[in-house]
Regions:
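GST-like fold's C-terminal all-alpha helical module
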Residues: 101-188
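Non-transmembrane alpha-helical segments in soluble domains
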Residues: 71, 75, 95-98, 139, ...
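GST-like domain detector, emphasizing the conserved glutathione-binding G-site
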Residues: 1-125
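Charged phosphate-binding loop/patch that engages nucleotide di/tri-phosphates or the phosphate backbone
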Residues: 185-199
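Residue-level signal for nonpolar/aromatic packing positions in well-ordered secondary structure
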Residues: 56, 158, 190-193
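Long amphipathic alpha-helical segments
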Residues: 148, 199-204
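Conserved residues at the C-terminal ends of beta-strands
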Residues: 59, 161, 202
Length: 204
């Protein structure tokens, strides 16, 4: 299997953490790929029309898109029910938490692209503020309802690690650690896991 990835991508990081936790990392060839916002990225569009990272390319040439779907595939490959509960109320709680985190990451990337790609005179601050509020309020929800922080390690906790790591990486002055001490403690605890530490994004 091959995984297209960038060390800076929180979505690719999610898959990398999962692969390590599931004992499958040695079965995956991690292939660096560059997707530049606002550029055609024609070569990468041959792999996926969405031009998004990551993509898992199976040995038969078929592709699996979306970081969650890739983790779900790897989880099943490892026997199932490891990072995504197989059934019951916990399954739906974990999936719902992950969906929230996925949306938070989407909004954070949109904020990043607004500043990085759009010419300064055309940037829309109200739009950026709206999307940042989605990420910030999502953090507030996990701070207020911290049950997700103490479950056995799952896909939602991986997603939260990636959200907080991306906040440190791209929004270092946002103040999330001071605002959300429970999330700060959770993140520090997670850094003790080799999968989390080895997958940290590069220095911004």
């Amino acid at each position: 299997m091959k995984l297209t990835f960038s060390p800076a991508s929180p979505f690719a990081r999610k898959v990398r953490i999962a692969a390590i936790e599931l004992g499958l990392v040695d079965k995956i060839e991690f292939t660096p790929a560059a997707v530049v916002p606002g550029q055609p990225n024609d070569d990468y569009s041959k792999i996926t029309p969405l031009k998004k990272l990551p993509v898992l390319i199976l040995d038969d040439g078929s592709v699996i898109l979306d970081s969650y779907v890739i983790v779900e595939y790897l989880d099943e490959l490892a026997g199932g029910g490891k990072l995504i509960p197989a059934s019951g109320p916990t399954r739906w709680k974990v999936k719902s938490d992950h969906s929230l985190l996925q949306g938070m990451l989407d909004s954070m990337l949109l904020c990043r692209y607004e500043k990085l790609v759009r010419p300064q005179g055309l940037q829309w601050q109200a739009w950026t503020d709206y999307h940042w509020s989605r990420a910030w309020n999502g953090m507030a929800r996990f701070e207020k309802h911290p049950d997700a922080l103490s479950r056995p390690f799952d896909i939602a906790q991986i997603g939260l690690v990636c959200v907080l790591g991306y906040a440190d990486f791209r929004f270092a002055d946002c103040g999330w650690r001071k605002a959300y001490p429970k999330l700060d403690a959770f993140h520090e605890k997670m850094l003790a896991r080799p999968s989390v530490k080895v997958s940290l994004p590069p220095t911004a």
